[in-house]
Amino acid sequence: MIGLNTAAIYILQTLGSLYLLIVLLRFILQLVRADFYNPLSQFIVRATKPLLNPLRRIIPGFGGIDLASLVLAILIQLVLMILILMLMGYGVGGFIMQLLIWSIIAVTSLFLKVFFFALIISVILSWVAPGSYNPGAQLVNQICEPLLMPFRKLLPNLGGLDLSPIFAFLALKLIDMLVINNLAAMTGMPQQLSIFL
């Protein structure tokens, strides 16, 4: 029985986190004004449409921000946490507000991770395939550009040497360590849910 629960938790976490990532990417792509005609963007739009369209009737966008996809990401994270805790044998009845707070923290952590790994991919592509125009590379660059732009404005021109990714990495890591981890600790997030950070 324990083995079955462990397997169920693994499958639920893997599939749930994958769909959560797709939903959060939908939010990020609209946030950074990415090309929605990109084949990967179109896949993300189609994958999220069944759940997002009904939610959009209740939650409209605001200032160019796709609030419906952000709310959907938080709700998916909340359901994932509830189901995983229940499979572990914990009651969740009196902890819904805490679980909601932990869900927001976890989604924020994933948000930072998307930019972190997009930066890694962007740096690698700039070394091995500079000027590549495949859909994946184009989308990664569009995600990274708004993050790198403020650092490029602050840093001096070093004759083609772009140090902005290094400072962006440091900023993301500091936010993760000083804000996300501390918020999780301050709100008493249990060890069982740290898999989402």
From Swiss-Prot:
Signal peptide: none annotated. Disulfide bonds: none annotated. The chain crosses the membrane at residues 9-29, 67-87, 104-124, 160-180. It is found in: Cell membrane. Its main location: membrane. It is a multi-pass membrane protein. It comes from the Bacteria. Keywords: Cell membrane, Membrane, Transmembrane, Transmembrane helix. Pfam families: YGGT. One of its GO terms (cellular component) is plasma membrane. Belongs to the YggT family. This is Uncharacterized protein PA0392. It comes from Pseudomonas aeruginosa (strain ATCC 15692 / DSM 22644 / CIP 104116 / JCM 14847 / LMG 12228 / 1C / PRS 101 / PAO1).
